[in-house]
A protein has these predicted regions:
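Conserved SAM/SAH-binding beta-strand->alpha-helix loop
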Residues: 55-57
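Gly/Ala-rich phosphate-binding loop of Rossmann-like dinucleotide-binding domains
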Residues: 41-42
Length: 242
């Protein structure tokens, strides 16, 4: 390291890093500035890291960051789309963070070998978690745990999963509100925000004169019912009153 300088991660990236077991072999997809791989090496969490990005610019930023901390020789920099630049046998942990849920979905869809119990997946969608969660569960990725991080006044979910499991559908509430967040201290406020946004969406649909929006309004009502139920269960489990 450059004079023993330690990299400080954002709370969102730190939450992901803390879930990576010491000795892991990691692929960081969409590595951007390479901050997560640098932190993992500094703290002895990984024995191998492939820092991957589909654009040369971010990958060059990652190289420069690694040089600043004297770690450029310990990282494998890969230029390629998604997991296309990763050899399945060289890793056991896959991190895909800071992308939209639909983008994460498409990356995994293009790499069916990830649906195997040998791999731990750490996913952090910036948007469309309600699209990503059902797809994962319906394709045999089981949720090991979830947590929320509040960053820039937005609640971001972090998910740990493993492939090779039985496929099962999720409820609307689980798709939107999470699968394993019952004990998360931020879940109550995150559900409040979801309820506010879904109510706003429903109000807009109810004012619409487009026939198709009636069906969409019914779905929003169903989502709201299940989210309210989840909020009640969270309050009960955490000994709180509404």
């Amino acid at each position: 390291m450059d004079g023993g300088k330690e990299l400080i991660l954002s709370e969102r990236l730190l939450a992901i890093a803390q879930w990576i077991r010491p000795g892991s072999r990691v692929a960081d997809i969409g590595t951007d500035h390479g901050y997560l791989p640098i932190w993992l090496l500094q703290h002895g969490r990984a024995t191998f890291i492939a820092a991957c990005d589909m654009r040369e610019g971010p990958l060059e930023h990652a190289r420069r960051s690694a040089e600043q901390y004297g770690l450029q020789e310990k990282l494998s920099f890969r230029l390629g789309s998604g997991l296309s630049c990763v050899v399945p046998e060289e890793i056991d942990t896959i991190v895909i963070a800071g992308m939209g849920g639909e983008t994460i979905l498409s990356i995994l869809e293009a790499a069916p070998w990830t649906n195997n119990a040998r791999y731990t997946l750490l996913l952090q969608p910036m948007t469309k978690a309600e699209v990503l969660r059902p797809w994962l569960s319906e394709h045999g990725y089981s949720f090991l745990r979830e947590r929320l991080v509040l960053e820039n006044r937005t609640y971001f979910p972090i998910m740990a999963l493993r492939g090779g499991s039985a496929c099962r559908p999720l409820s609307l509430g689980q798709a939107w509100g999470g699968v394993a967040l019952q004990d998360d201290p931020l879940q109550g406020r995150a559900l409040d925000e979801l309820l506010r946004l879904r109510t706003y969406a429903l109000n807009g649909l109810e004012r619409s004169v487009v026939p198709k929006n009636r069906e969409r309004a019914e779905q929003q009502r169903a989502i709201l019912v299940q989210l309210r139920q989840m909020k009640g269960e969270w309050l009960h489990a955490n000994g709180k009153r509404n």
